[in-house]
Amino acid sequence: MADVERLVDLLAKVREKSRHLVLKVEGRYVAVGDLHGDLDTLERVLEEWEPPYLFLGDYVDRGDHGLEVVEQVFQLLVEGKAVALRGNHESPAMNLDGGFLDELCEKIGRKCGAVYKEFEKTFAALPLVAVVNGKIVALHGGIPLKDDMTPAALEEVEKISGDMAIPRDPLAFQILWNDPCPCEKYAPSPRGPGIWLFGAEVTKAFHERHGTRTIVRGHTYVPSGCALHHSGGVVTVFSSSAGPYKRTKPKIALVKDGVEVYDLATKNSAKCPQDIDIF
């Protein structure tokens, strides 16, 4: 059984360190895409790549070791060795059906409901965006669109307020859920209402507005473990090979002034497919 007192204390420490929706960080980071309870991949990353790490969200659900994964990620965050962004699966709406709540009850027992409430508060406090060296934007899903269908500025994201447990603010919601598409402007997403596919013109306008070069993101399952979109203006990294993702070739990325993708199995530089249709 998990040490409940220690776990609750860890979650409180994460909340203490998570005070901004948009982080600005300096240095070189190892970016890790969706893990979805893939403890083997996480441990391999920690063994073979030096910190600091930049986790792009989706630590839980679908795989068998969501609790162990999110504990390790949060411990690294508290120790100052990692940035941990929020994914769309860091949400009660997803954890109910995705498996994390059931996993928690199996591993913690009768206190799982109270402990999950602590997770819910902690997930709600996680940052949505990290800007690395002023040039690389890291987030889970994609560029959020305003009512006039132009890309929102990060300054607007910083001002988001209200209950974030299930983000009702459309900009926060879209950061967690949007995806790039091989199109010019935008299109409704098959994922559901309020979610958008954003095209090359949106990416270009976003980078011009912020003086940035590349967005590194997770969220989208690609069997190759990575994909380039919009002439390299967006890079997708997927790291899980657990649960339904056993055929994935997991990737990570080194992020500094650019984004270099590497194969987790070989540690060689990876060639990623370009402008694929992800749906």
Which stretches of residues belong to each language-model region?
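Feature recognizes metal-dependent phosphohydrolase scaffolds
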Residues: M1-F279
